[in-house]
Amino acid sequence: MSWDYRPLLSGQSRDPFSSMARGALWCASGFYNVAARHRRRQYDSGNREICNAGVPVISVGNLTTGGTGKTPVVADLCRRLRAMDFRVTIISRGYGASDGRMNDEAMELQERLPDVPHVQHPDRVEAARIAVEELAAEVLVMDDGFQHRRLQRDLDIVVIDATCPFGYGHVLPRGTLREPLDSVTRADWVLITRVDQVDPEEVLAIRSTIAQHAPDCPVLETEHRPSTIQSSVGDWEAIEVLIDQPVALVSAIGNPDAFEQTVLDCGAIVVDHLRLPDHDSYERATREKLRSWVTKLKGGPQPPQRLLCTHKDAVKLATDSIAGVPLGYMPIELAYRTSEEPLQLRLELLMGGSVENQSSRDDSA
């Protein structure tokens, strides 16, 4: 199992070792903070080159490491753009990919959006070039792009997870902020995800913190809603079958607590949860450990009737059972608690301008 660093970073661990570790991490964060601010000044002052892809670029990113729920946001944006009849391509760095294969996020998006190409490249400027020149993309959605400022973007969307919004108040490694919190001033929109998993007062506090740094930035509230239970072979069941059903969970994601809470909210009884490192590739040793774990649970006082994982895990496991216990996943869809109309209008305005610019170029040619 992976080490749970959250009690240390959050301050819940009060033992002497944890206190010393937080002090050491705080010192290291000072160097990281200086480097992050220097990099930001370089871009803000124009000392670093920013490349134009030639088509609109919509960035979906976050302030923190770990799972904030970007994938359903990316899928939602791509569906909206496809409904407007534009050729969309997703570009990303491809973190966790190996041997030329797509990473788990790209595999999940491919299943969600079979008509949307996905270009993964360590250099996202090159990924944008491939998408535009070779795939004739008319708009790019850059996954995890907030800190990747070398590619110019026309819309910067920051995703904040309500269950852990601001990385314990510190940049890496003392917290999980990728850059200082005031960087949210660059955002054009903020989407707060999983607002249903926290109290309304906490959502108001998140909004207040955002407003301190970006008072004019629109903020939308969203929930992650499971639609059905699916298997790798395409079978599906209504989500209601989980009510009072003993289940065991396995996940290799950045925010396993949020996944577990989603399952609990569906009425299931969670017997155990095997938490693996984020982006674990489920190699043979991991699969053997997984089978042993399930076998042990089957002989326990409350054997699980079903195993559940996330969509990201399902595309890597590629099986419908483990040790004789059915395995399924719950596709998560984005549901807007606040009106989504302003975002839709912003996309239409962005793409309408793109069409006009393209027409002008065609006329001048």
UniProtKB/Swiss-Prot annotation:
Its EC number is 2.7.1.130. GO terms for molecular function: ATP binding; tetraacyldisaccharide 4'-kinase activity. The keyword ATP-binding applies. GO terms for biological process: lipid A biosynthetic process; lipopolysaccharide core region biosynthetic process. Pathway: Glycolipid biosynthesis; lipid IV(A) biosynthesis; lipid IV(A) from (3R)-3-hydroxytetradecanoyl-[acyl-carrier-protein] and UDP-N-acetyl-alpha-D-glucosamine: step 6/6. It catalyses: a lipid A disaccharide + ATP = a lipid IVA + ADP + H(+). GO terms for cellular component: plasma membrane. The keyword Nucleus does not apply. ATP binds at T64, T65, G66, G67, T68, G69, K70, T71. InterPro entries: LpxK, P-loop_NTPase. Keywords: ATP-binding, Kinase, Lipid A biosynthesis, Lipid biosynthesis, Lipid metabolism, Nucleotide-binding, Transferase. Pfam families: LpxK (PF02606). Belongs to the LpxK family. HAMAP family: LpxK. Transfers the gamma-phosphate of ATP to the 4'-position of a tetraacyldisaccharide 1-phosphate intermediate (termed DS-1-P) to form tetraacyldisaccharide 1,4'-bis-phosphate (lipid IVA). This is Tetraacyldisaccharide 4'-kinase.
